Amino acid sequence: MFIDLTPEQRQLQAEIRQYFSNLISPDERTEMEKDRHGPAYRAVIRRMGRDGRLGVGWPKEFGGLGFGPIEQQIFVNEAHRADVPLPAVTLQTVGPTLQAHGSELQKKKFLPAILAGEAHFAIGYTEPEAGTDLASLRTTAVRDGDHYIVNGQKVFTTGAHDADYIWLACRTDPNAAKHKGISILIVDTKDPGYSWTPIILADGAHHTNATYYNDVRVPVDMLVGKENDGWRLITTQLNNERVMLGPAGRFASIYDRVHAWASVPGGNGVTPIDHDDVKRALGEIRAIWRINELLNWQVASAGEDINMADAAATKVFGTERVQRAGRLAEEIVGKYGNPAEPDTAELLRWLDAQTKRNLVITFGGGVNEVMREMIAASGLKVPRVPR
């Protein structure tokens, strides 16, 4: 069976590709290389909101365009292909989870603001002492009248330095089994008890943070779903996040740039793509890109019924293979390019930044070692590793 996009989906893809091709100014792109969540990022997302582009995969009843999950993947892939940042956590995980489990007040307050590019969320799950074992989290939320009082610390909270809200996992019942006593609260980052410190990663950019909650007051109506039923929301949100971490557009971006560079003779008169090893490397990158695209379509099309093992497998494949694609690209550009030539130097700089940035996603949404355990236990029914 040959699986491909319909003519209508191809048309949508072309429209989105054209839209993204001139969305970002050079100054905005330069600023976002150092801070992916600052003023330039905000301006770009608001622009997409004004243009009605953020709701491609959202149902019309929530203000979206009413397309399906494949069209949403097209949107995400084309954004990554053009190196355009998206409010991915907000748009693709928090938004859909609120649509399914949020109160009417929460839907009315947050969903239109998300589609307008005005509301930005960060995910507060990981803790210094718990790591990927989310069920061992210690951040507490104690009921006090019509508020919860939150105390604790999170780490690797991406975008928290610029977020309007934190989607926070808290322990609301210390006596319950560790998976049972967790709730999800929406924390307003304007609360005086909220603070953060930056964590600068390998690419030199400010993506993520440690976040602190010191007697933060959260209104009871900012509890998502039922109290102590947060684990179900966490797994729903994380399954969606894992699919979005390995979009095929990451591969397409590498392929497009390196293929274009390799097709032009260098200063020495040699055209890199004439060499067999360059053709092999580009062929492998293109093949990985296509496989990842098909995996994303398959898993995304499951919608709310997304399988945990499938989401984890997609995440592992995409995040690890994009590392290989980056290494293959750097090898051929380093071998056949001259760093003294501006185009080659810029491509090498870009590839280095991409490789370092893509390293981060191997542990976003759960480290890949844990993902493999989930694939084995949930997908292959292999007994879990004793701890």
UniProtKB/Swiss-Prot annotation:
Entry's cofactor comment: Binds 1 FAD per heterodimer.
Signal peptide from the UniProt entry: none
Catalytic-site annotation from UniProt: 241
Keyword Flavoprotein: yes
Domain of life of the organism encoding this protein: Bacteria
Top-level enzyme category: oxidoreductase
Keyword NAD: yes
One biological process term in Gene Ontology: cholesterol catabolic process
Pathway connected to this protein: Steroid metabolism; cholesterol degradation
Protein induction: Induced by cholesterol and repressed by KtsR.
Entries under Pfam families matching the protein: Acyl-CoA_dh_1 (PF00441), Acyl-CoA_dh_M (PF02770), Acyl-CoA_dh_N (PF02771)
Cofactor(s) required for function per UniProt: FAD
Gene3D superfamilies for this protein: Acyl-CoA dehydrogenase/oxidase, N-terminal domain, Butyryl-CoA Dehydrogenase, subunit A, domain 2, Butyryl-CoA Dehydrogenase, subunit A, domain 3
UniProt EC number: 1.3.99.-
Entry-linked PANTHER family: ACYL-COA DEHYDROGENASE (PTHR43292), ACYL-COA DEHYDROGENASE FADE29 (PTHR43292:SF3)
Family membership: Belongs to the acyl-CoA dehydrogenase family.
Quaternary context: Heterotetramer composed of FadE28 and FadE29.
Function, in words: Involved in the third cycle of side chain dehydrogenation in the beta-oxidation of cholesterol catabolism. Contributes partly to the virulence by increasing the efficiency of beta-oxidation. Catalyzes the dehydrogenation of 2'-propanoyl-CoA ester side chains of 3-oxo-4-pregnene-20-carboxyl-CoA (3-OPC-CoA) to yield 3-oxo-4,17-pregnadiene-20-carboxyl-CoA (3-OPDC-CoA). Also able to dehydrogenate steroyl-CoA such as 3-oxo-chol-4-en-24-oyl-CoA (3-OCO-CoA), 1beta-(2'-propanoyl-CoA)-3a-alpha-H- 7a-beta-methylhexahydro-4-indanone (indanone-CoA ester), hexahydroindanone and pregenenone.
Protein name: Acyl-CoA dehydrogenase FadE29
Taxonomic source organism: Mycobacterium tuberculosis (strain ATCC 25618 / H37Rv)
